[in-house]
Every structure is written in structure tokens, then in C-alpha cells.
Amino acid sequence: MTDDAPTEQTTGDNVGDVLDVLTLLDEVRTIAQNGLQYAENPYDRERYDRLLALASDGYGDLFDLPPETVRERFAAEVGHATAKVGGGAAIFDDEGRLLLVERADDGTWGLPSGYVDPGESPAETAVRETREETGAEIEVVDLVDVYYRPPGQLGPHSLVSLRYLCERRGGDLTTSHETTAVRYWELDDVPVWHKDHEGAARDAYEVWRAHRQP
């Protein structure tokens, strides 16, 4: 499950400023991490390290986190800085209802999904996250689409997310520490969607319908 949105609510008066700051911080972080990956000159490395520290301070102020904690997380991301990659599953029953999870952190409803672990494909992520969040065992049927979210839009980092049409093969539906409810929904009846999941869900419904055509 992924959720890297700001901890404080933004209003119409300041949301534009927050997005601008997040975009700037993401660019500074990327320059710093890529510089530390490739620079050999010790003076250049010192400058890039300072840039990373400044970005850490900015993220810390914005998300109310200790800058040292942010710095440690950035330092753990070795190699060339890239966008986050996620995988998610859309599982429909025979009546066209979609399996969704109610998130424990904000009470919204969304597709089982999460970040790709090292050595894992996005499709494998969709299967794993569904098992962890719902208890269901699934099989990937088709790729619905690839979605891109720029930094500052519903989260601080760039995100490339692959959403898959899947079929349930077994398992008993159950909640986890990340979810408070698991159930099938008619798309138009979902009370509150999580972030941008509604668009992906409706795209998946069209793919599901196409697969059911004789």
C-alpha cells in the first residue's frame, strides 16, 4: 500500500504553493542523488551532499518529520534517482462489482496496490499487495494502463503505476493492519475514492467488459 501525501490538509489558498515547493524539492533531491551517484570530485560530492541536506530540511518542514530521518531515507536509495513504481489490481466479480479496500490511514476506498519491491515486477506487486491487503489469491489477466503522477500531485514524488485486470482464484477475504474493510462495490456507489483510484477503476471496468465480449 502506498501513501506519501502531506500530513496536513491543504486549502485552495495554499495548495498551489505546496505543489510548487514539492516539485522544486523533488528536482533538488534528484540532482543531489544523481550527483552523489556519479561525481568523483570530492568538492562536487560535498556540494551534492549539501543539496541533499537542503532537500531533506525542506521535506522535513513540509511533512513535519525530523530532517535526519528524511536524510537517512534518501541515503538508503542508492543508484540513479528515478520515479517511484507501483502496481495495483482490479478484481471484478461476475456482476461487475470491484473489490476494494478501505484504508486504515484515511478511511478512503481504493484498489489493492503498493510500491514495487526490489527484484519484483509490477504484476507481481499487484498479486502480493492483493494477498496482503485482502487475503485474496489472484491471477493477472491484462494490463489496464500505465499511469503517471508528477511530484506534488497527491504525493511528493513522481509515480509510475501499472494497474492490472485480475481474476480471483481463491483465498478468504480478510483485513490487514493496512485495511479496515474489504468488499465488492458497484463503481457508482463507492463513498470516497482514494486519491486517483477512481479513474483507474473505471478504465479497468472497460477492459473487464471487453474481455467478457464473445
Go through each PLM region and give its residues.
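Nudix hydrolase/Nudix homology domain
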Residues: 2-50, 54, 108, 177-214
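A detector of low-complexity, intrinsically disordered, Ser/Thr/Gly/Pro/Ala-rich segments
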Residues: 5-9, 98, 132, 173
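General structural signal for alpha-helix termini and helix-helix connectors
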Residues: 34-38, 76, 149
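Acidic, metal-coordinating catalytic segment for phosphate/diphosphate chemistry
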Residues: 43-88
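N-terminal strand-loop-strand
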Residues: 70-109, 138, 142
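Residue-level signal for pocket-adjacent positions within structured domains
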Residues: 80, 104-106, 111, 168, ...
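Conserved Nudix-box catalytic region and its N-terminal flanking loop in Nudix hydrolases
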Residues: 93-128, 132
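Unchanged
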Residues: 116-140, 147-204
